[in-house]
UniProtKB/Swiss-Prot annotation:
<feature type="compositionally biased region" description="Polar residues">
    <location>
        <begin position="133"/>
        <end position="142"/>
    </location>
</feature>
<feature type="compositionally biased region" description="Polar residues">
    <location>
        <begin position="168"/>
        <end position="179"/>
    </location>
</feature>
<comment type="similarity">
    <text>Belongs to the BCL7 family.</text>
</comment>
<feature type="compositionally biased region" description="Polar residues">
    <location>
        <begin position="73"/>
        <end position="83"/>
    </location>
</feature>
<protein>
    <recommendedName>
        <fullName>B-cell CLL/lymphoma 7 protein family member A</fullName>
    </recommendedName>
</protein>
<feature type="compositionally biased region" description="Basic and acidic residues">
    <location>
        <begin position="192"/>
        <end position="201"/>
    </location>
</feature>
<feature type="compositionally biased region" description="Basic and acidic residues">
    <location>
        <begin position="54"/>
        <end position="71"/>
    </location>
</feature>
<feature type="compositionally biased region" description="Basic and acidic residues">
    <location>
        <begin position="158"/>
        <end position="167"/>
    </location>
</feature>
<feature type="compositionally biased region" description="Polar residues">
    <location>
        <begin position="93"/>
        <end position="114"/>
    </location>
</feature>
<feature type="region of interest" description="Disordered">
    <location>
        <begin position="46"/>
        <end position="201"/>
    </location>
</feature>
<dbReference type="InterPro" id="IPR006804">
    <property type="entry name" value="BCL7"/>
</dbReference>
<dbReference type="Pfam" id="PF04714">
    <property type="entry name" value="BCL_N"/>
</dbReference>
Length: 201
């Protein structure tokens, strides 16, 4: 009798392990690696971000995305506890994607962060706005002018991102900010120094 009970126990443990593995695979399918900016700085890192799945049933597109993700390393982020939280858009955290390399995601998702073309337009608009605000101030060199454009474009991106994230839940925003600060490794004091140096120039 003891042999049968041991086998049954092993079988039930194996079933639990299979369930755990399948849940981990489902989590990985909803995340992908992308280039994102860190806060208001120009620092870009390649990290795992949640995939926003469209509500329309594009099974072919989803299968292509799954095949692409298996080539990279398999990790599950520690701040993803339920599938409902993973479906939220990654703009809730203080990051935005700059170079979205997958055209598949641009076609399928409606509320992704701006693609490179709108960003280029926003940089031109922000530089025109900067020139209109300060017509008497002429930059002494090309580098000063470029730094002003970069600073202004980062401010416009931040304001767009803030307006998008106001409609989403506040608790997820706080948890994702703290998780990103841990992942990025850049302390808030360093970010403050970068912001103050860009304001001085």
């Amino acid at each position: 009798m003891s042999g049968r009970s041991v086998r049954a126990e092993t079988r039930s443990r194996a079933k639990d392990d299979i369930k755990r593995v399948m849940a981990a695979i489902e989590k990985v399918r909803k995340w992908e690696k992308k280039w994102v900016t860190v806060g208001d700085t120009s620092l870009r890192i390649y990290k795992w971000v949640p995939v926003t799945e469209p509500k329309s049933d594009d099974n072919k597109n989803k299968k292509k995305g799954k095949d692409d993700k298996y080539g990279s390393e398999v990790t599950t982020p520690e701040n993803s506890s339920s599938p409902g939280m993973m479906d939220m858009h990654d703009d809730n955290s203080n990051q935005s994607s700059i170079a979205d390399s997958s055209p598949l995601k641009q076609e399928t998702s409606n509320n992704t962060s701006p693609a490179p073309e709108p960003m280029a337009a926003s940089q031109n608009d922000s530089s025109d706005l900067k020139n209109d605000q300060y017509p008497s101030k002429q930059p002494s060199s090309g580098q000063d002018h470029k730094s002003e454009q970069n600073h202004c474009s980062s401010e416009s991106m931040t304001s767009k991102r803030d307006s998008k994230s106001q409609g989403d839940s506040e608790s997820f925003l706080d948890s994702s900010k703290s998780a990103q600060e841990l992942e990025d490794g850049a302390p808030p004091s360093k970010k403050g120094k970068i912001d103050s140096s860009s304001e001085e120039s």
